[in-house]
Amino acid sequence: MRTLNTSAMDGTGLVVERDFSVRILTACFLSLLILSTLLGNTLVCAAVIRFRHLRSKVTNFFVISLAVSDLLVAVLVMPWKAVAEIAGFWPFGSFCNIWVAFDIMCSTASILNLCVISVDRYWAISSPFRYERKMTPKAAFILISVAWTLSVLISFIPVQLSWHKAKPTSPSDGNATSLAETIDNCDSSLSRTYAISSSVISFYIPVAIMIVTYTRIYRIAQKQIRRIAALERAAVHAKNCQTTTGNGKPVECSQPESSFKMSFKRETKVLKTLSVIMGVFVCCWLPFFILNCILPFCGSGETQPFCIDSITFDVFVWFGWANSSLNPIIYAFNADFRKAFSTLLGCYRLCPATNNAIETVSINNNGAAMFSSHHEPRGSISKECNLVYLIPHAVGSSEDLKKEEAAGIARPLEKLSPALSVILDYDTDVSLEKIQPITQNGQHPT
């Protein structure tokens, strides 16, 4: 306040200059955010349109629906608000109600698509055989249709019928508020009923479902990783016990410590992966929805706790929209999409090498699993097959694979008939785990 008063005393010229500088910085930042959201989600949509093998994967339907909702946020929501932020008023007149409906619809659709993706991944990893039979393109379209229908119902109908607005305390206040909103303001106050009900449907129920599904995914992955480690230790132990010296006497057997370390690292990677997924989503949207439920209970001019000014509230609104720029990185940056992006952008030489070390985890009918590795050539696009992503953004490193090989960790189940195959990309920090289809003889297709 002291700085503001001093600048005002220095003359209006300095105030205008500082205000102009703030507007320029705001315009640059918001433009970068909008462009990054447009670029990321446009690349996802273009990759699926361009490459048939991406369209053949049912789980990619949900990723595309998410990309479309985030793309609509960048086209129908963010630019109009950015212009209003820079101009200092709402210059689009009666378009306000339509914009508010678009805002609620697109943001809700993005969040519900994230929820559907978490449920899809949980079904795929918890009941893989049933998932392969039940999760058809028709079933995927039904889930996507439910998410979008709910988003439309919660947005356009209440907004067009003015159910979302708070009732004015007096007729004079109502006329003044309507006139202000029509001329230069589109920040209409929500009614308490609509603010709470829409927040519950748009955020609190989906985030609760996501917490449950990703927690269960971590527990399943933890059990499988420990089972793998136990089998690897047993295989190494048996191999060491069968080794003999020159005089025919067996060598003393020892349990390898490297297997315990690798098991712990794998569990840590899964935990970090799921923490990134939930952490980014919650950090972006939770502050807004908390304030969205509190502000309707704040009277005009009140200075109660959490009754913040409009500028602070707008900052948290942009935090929520920023989630749309991060979703392509988290959910559509696996090996298949990265290769498609490299092809679309024509940057095989400039982009990071795609000669990735791939570790395959095969799980048989008894729930046992094994790891094996292979390499994919630079610039190659995987053949068309039905794959299902389980956990996005699995974090890995090629050094772990080298350490396992140097430690002599065996692959105990290589000869078994695997039922499922889960691929972890070890060359990058972002990848998706997948399930390969099963042939009639119970083997993976070659």
Swiss-Prot record:
Glycans are attached at N5, N175. Residues 1-23, 88-96, 164-192, 300-312 are extracellular. A lipid is attached at C347, C351 (S-palmitoyl cysteine). CDD domains: 7tmA_D1A_dopamine_R. The chain crosses the membrane at residues 24-49, 61-87, 97-119, 139-163, 193-218, 273-299, 313-337. The keyword Cell membrane applies. Coiled coil: none annotated. Keywords: Cell membrane, Cell projection, Disulfide bond, Endoplasmic reticulum, G-protein coupled receptor, Glycoprotein, Lipoprotein, Membrane, Palmitate, Receptor, Synapse, Transducer, Transmembrane, Transmembrane helix. GO terms for biological process: adenylate cyclase-activating adrenergic receptor signaling pathway; adenylate cyclase-activating dopamine receptor signaling pathway; G protein-coupled dopamine receptor signaling pathway; G protein-coupled receptor signaling pathway, coupled to cyclic nucleotide second messenger; phospholipase C-activating dopamine receptor signaling pathway; positive regulation of MAPK cascade; positive regulation of release of sequestered calcium ion into cytosol; vasodilation. GO terms for molecular function: arrestin family protein binding; dopamine binding; dopamine neurotransmitter receptor activity, coupled via Gs; G protein-coupled receptor activity; G-protein alpha-subunit binding; heterotrimeric G-protein binding. Residues 50-60, 120-138, 219-272, 338-446 are cytoplasmic. Disulfide bonds join C96-C186. Interacts with DNAJC14 via its C-terminus. Interacts with DRD2. Interacts with DORIP1. This is D(1A) dopamine receptor. It comes from Macaca mulatta (Rhesus macaque).
